[in-house]
Amino acid sequence: MNKVKRKKIMHSQVALQIAVFILCALVVYPFLTLIIKSFKDYEQEVYSPITFTFPLHFENYEIAWLYVKNSIFNSFFVSISISVMCVLLSAMGGYAFSRFSFKGKEIVYSLTVALMMMPSILILTSKYVLVSVTFKMYDSFLGVIVPQAAGLVPFGIMLLRGYFDSLPKGLLEAAEIDGANSAVQFIKITVPLSIPMVMTLFLMNFMTSWNDYLWPLMILHDEAKFTISVNLQSFTDYFYKMNQYYAPALAGYVIVSLPILVLFGFTSKQFIQGMTAGAFKM
């Protein structure tokens, strides 16, 4: 029986490893193809589209950088602004729902969380009219930042409230006895204890904002204000119409992927800590 069990376990492990390998290959292959094609010229792209060819055309990256460098800085500004605004509002909202008791609290919380269930496409037109006509924020960074941050806040409140509820109540009670008001408890106790979850929320919002395409496309008109997703699509269409190949545009996609990869590489530990902490504590 033991031998039979060991064989079953070994077979299941082998099957699991094969499945993981296949999934990893499916994830890595498109990005690897993107890198390979970004070094080609027209003839190499046509006749050897998915294999390495020589010479490597690094000038594709020079062309792409000249076109996307301004929009990279725009995207950094927009993504960081959205992430910071969302984290601040979510932390304050989550803390209020976690620590304070007021009439209708659970109803308000349920309505806030219910906003996540509404497909964003349903309110796209009304949001556009509100931002561009009512608040006169068309073709401005504020028109991109404020609505996107507001849309991410309900999830942040839900995430942080669950984490705040799990923190030791004794620490806050002791601080209250020592004379610390709610603001001091929030700034000096709750937030420092919640850094992994706060960092996780920041990273999730940053990646969402960095990759967002539809809303910046609708709001921004001046090319100097384009975010990277909008600018890359414009660059891809323009370059292909003029030259009939995609390599410099693909080089642009590689360039704009690097900040996310570097950011995640340096913060993956905090990201995983926050996700696992949230899984156990929510």
Predicted regions and their residues:
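N-terminal Lys/Arg-rich, disordered targeting/topogenic segments
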Residues: M1-K3
